[in-house]
From Swiss-Prot:
Leukotriene C4 binds at residues 52, 136, 154. The gene is D7L. Keywords: Disulfide bond, Hemostasis impairing toxin, Platelet aggregation inhibiting toxin, Secreted, Signal, Toxin. Modulates blood feeding of female sandflies on vertebrate species by binding and sequestering different mediators involved in the host response. Binds leukotriene C4, leukotriene D4, leukotriene E4 and U-46619, a stable analog of thromboxane A2. Does not bind histamine or serotonin. Inhibits platelet aggregation induced by low concentrations of collagen in thromboxane A2-dependent manner. This is Long form salivary protein D7L. Residues 1-19 form the signal peptide. It comes from the Eukaryota. Thromboxane A2 binds at residues 49, 63, 154.
Length: 249
């Protein structure tokens, strides 16, 4: 019951709508995969996920939901997948849209298990194309990073990248525009990522929601500054932990 109340409070404070730009790039998909894997570091199936195998167990069910959500492909309002965006991602990567893509359309009950059941056959039937479309093959991912040197490289800490070349200013007079984005406190449009789960870093959902609320009347990279300062105020070690993890997200 407490978990339900917490969830309702969180949603009432921050809302459930978000609309990320599509297609997603290799940095954004890499963050999604690594973030969801890190949130379940003790899972027995973790090594299977690295190989893009999704066994039928409870941890994997929630890993699948996590990935869809962090790719911007799960609509929390109607509890369904954004099939149009999946198609857009395939098109952007010159990958043929799978014939069975409509099998994953329509609502779920929102549980990890139901989302897994809804999508696992589609995943298994198209895993190689999905890996290509979402940069899930190391060679393709590395090629993208090489071609996009304005993005934080793999193996580089967020602090090292963002403190160089005045990146923290965000093209304005901000202080944490770059870091707040790469810590994924905000998205590429400086909108707070309301579902960001920092519990394992000592930031509760209620605390994060209060940061989102504090940023409500800010504009542009001032939203990023507000989110950064608020999270740091709640737990000064949280962002340091993220920074130490950031060479591999």
């Amino acid at each position: 019951m407490n978990a339900v109340i917490t969830s309702l409070v969180f949603i009432s404070l921050v809302g459930v709508g978000y609309s990320w730009r599509y297609p997603r790039n290799a940095d954004q998909t890499f963050w999604a995969f690594r973030t969801c894997q890190r949130q379940s570091e003790g899972a027995k199936s973790l090594r299977e996920w690295y190989r893009w195998n999704l066994p039928n167990d409870e941890d994997t069910h929630c890993y699948v939901k996590c990935v869809w959500l962090h790719l911007g492909l799960y609509n929390e309002q109607n509890k369904s997948l954004r099939v149009d965006r999946i198609m857009e991602q395939f098109n952007s990567r010159s990958v043929a849209i799978p014939g069975g893509i409509n099998t994953i359309s329509g609502p779920t009950d929102g549980t990890c298990k139901d989302i897994y059941d809804k999508t696992i056959n589609f995943f298994n039937n198209n895993v190689n194309d999905l890996r290509t479309a979402f940069y899930g093959i190391k060679k393709l991912s590395d090629e993208w990073f090489t071609q996009n040197s304005n993005t934080k490289p793999k193996g580089t800490k967020i602090s090292d990248f963002c403190n160089a070349e005045n990146r923290e200013k965000g093209g304005a007079d901000c202080q944490h525009a770059c870091s707040a984005y790469y810590y994924r406190l905000v998205d590429e449009d400086n909108e707070p990522i309301h579902f960001r789960n920092l519990n394992i870093l000592g930031i509760t959902d209620e605390q994060f929601a209060s940061c989102v609320k504090a940023s409500k009347n800010k504009q542009g990279c001032k939203v990023a500054d507000t989110m950064y300062n608020c999270v740091e105020k709640h737990n000064s070690q949280a962002l340091k932990i993220l920074d130490n993890q950031s060479p591999t997200y």
